[in-house]
Curated annotation (Swiss-Prot):
EC class name: oxidoreductase
Organism this protein belongs to: Escherichia coli O157:H7
Similarity comment: Belongs to the DXR family.
Molecular function, one GO term: manganese ion binding
GO biological process, one term: isopentenyl diphosphate biosynthetic process, methylerythritol 4-phosphate pathway involved in terpenoid biosynthetic process
Binding-site positions, NADPH: 10-13, 36-38, 124, 126, 215
Quaternary structure, from the entry: Homodimer.
Keyword Metal-binding: yes
UniProt function note: Catalyzes the NADPH-dependent rearrangement and reduction of 1-deoxy-D-xylulose-5-phosphate (DXP) to 2-C-methyl-D-erythritol 4-phosphate (MEP).
UniProt catalytic activity: 2-C-methyl-D-erythritol 4-phosphate + NADP(+) = 1-deoxy-D-xylulose 5-phosphate + NADPH + H(+)
EC number: 1.1.1.267
Entry binding sites for Mn(2+): 150, 152, 231
Residues where 1-deoxy-D-xylulose 5-phosphate binds: 125, 151-152, 186, 209, 222, 227-228, 231
Protein name (Swiss-Prot/TrEMBL): 1-deoxy-D-xylulose 5-phosphate reductoisomerase
């Protein structure tokens, strides 16, 4: 029986994680749930899964949760704040920590889990995009086990040999017979839109993803392929891959979630329905397998599987992310922060779709790129980049 803390339990990944627990009550027990401000959903989760602890981001939400749980006779202890979240990630009897708090808020609790030597099911993109070196160093020092939840990185992980799986971020790909990692992406809803029309695309059009059901921010990131750029950065850290060992491919059907190319000419791929419960269940049960609740892939209903190289004129954000990695952690942190501001501005109809990449580049050019030495340095770069990005948005929108 694996004991589990879920950081970000009321979000999409958190709810999917609890669904896997629901399908496998004999394998997993929820010890602690950590969330932001969604008290209603947290009440439902506490009543169903009876965790020992529940943590809310702020005191007001925690007070409300405590009152509602007491009325229902729940014995779950309610806490609040970031330190409590970090404590839940490092609880002595917890085996696994699902790190699914979105954004910079997830950094310190995830790092607490790493330092406590836990098995970390990593769904928080920012951990590696902004703190890649810091996090991988901490993993090595504490002998924690990282298991990637993101569907692409999980597909790569499943397609890699065991010596690499057990030494993520440090194993030598070439020594293990790996030539390259092929990161696949759908290309988003504007894959075939004429380039001249991209400037007129609306937020609603950008959010109509052909295959995956996602939130609005990540849907826009899929349309710009910034999500693939961030995944490229994560993959470089996770798999200790050089630029020449990485390939990015457009795969419109989203059936092959990523591949690994070997020296003998073999290519191993992981296929499946586009459902996050598959990679979540894989990381939770690794090295075993459990029922995820996902329907089997029906090969007879599949159309052709097609692939193409990405066009950087269509996807300048992808190129920006690849170049930012070469500049270092300050650049990847600044790019991630700027992109959050520019995407929010696009969703608020303050800027055009094509302005996202232009403003992201502008922020990178204006930033002082000293390498961060600790998480506080990273948060400082993040805050500065957001401020520059806001000014750039206001300049363009006025």
């Amino acid at each position: 029986m694996k004991q589990l803390t879920i950081l970000g339990s009321t979000g999409s990944i958190g709810c999917s994680t609890l669904d896997v627990v629901r399908h496998n009550p004999e394998h997993f027990r929820v010890v602690a749930l950590v969330a932001g401000k969604n008290v209603t959903r947290m009440v439902e989760q506490c009543l169903e899964f009876s965790p020992r602890y529940a943590v809310m981001d702020d005191e007001a939400s925690a007070k409300l949760l405590k009152t509602m749980l007491q009325q229902q006779g729940s014995r779950t202890e309610v806490l609040s704040g970031q330190q409590a979240a970090c404590d839940m990630a490092a609880l002595e009897d917890v085996d696994q920590v699902m790190a699914a708090i979105v954004g910079a808020a997830g950094l310190l609790p995830t790092l607490a889990a790493i330092r406590a030597g836990k098995t970390i099911l990593l769904a928080n993109k920012e951990s590696l995009v902004t703190c890649g070196r810091l996090f991988m160093d901490a993993v090595k020092q504490s002998k924690a086990q990282l298991l990637p939840v993101d569907s692409e990185h999980n597909a790569i992980f499943q397609s890699l040999p065991q010596p690499i799986q057990h030494n993520l971020g440090y194993a030598d790909l070439e020594q293990n017979g790996v030539v390259s990692i092929l990161l696949t992406g759908s290309g988003g809803p504007f894959r075939e839109t004429p380039l001249r029309d991209l400037a007129t695309m609306t937020p609603d059009q950008a959010c109509r993803h052909p295959n995956w059901s996602m939130g609005r921010k990540i849907s826009v990131d899929s349309a710009t392929m910034m999500n693939k750029g961030l995944e490229y950065i994560e993959a470089r850290w996770l798999f200790n891959a050089s630029a020449s060992q990485m390939e990015v491919l457009i795969h419109p059907q989203s059936v092959i979630h990523s591949m690994v190319r070997y020296q003998d000419g073999s290519v191993l791929a992981q296929l499946g329905e586009p459902d996050m419960r598959t990679p979540i269940a894989h990381t939770m049960a690794w090295p075993n397998r459990v029922n995820s609740g996902v329907k089997p892939l029906d090969f007879c209903k599949l159309s052709a599987l097609t692939f193409a190289a990405p066009d950087y004129d269509r996807y300048p954000c992808l190129k920006l992310a690849m170049e930012a990695f070469e500049q270092g952690q300050a650049a990847t942190t600044a790019l991630n922060a700027a992109n959050e501001i520019t995407v929010a501005a696009f969703l608020a109809q303050q800027i055009r779709f094509t302005d996202i990449a232009a403003l992201n580049l502008s922020v990178l050019e204006k930033m002082d790129m000293r390498e961060p030495q600790c998480v506080d340095d990273v948060l400082s770069v993040d805050a500065s980049a957001r401020e520059v990005a806001r000014k750039e948005v206001m300049r363009l929108a006025s």
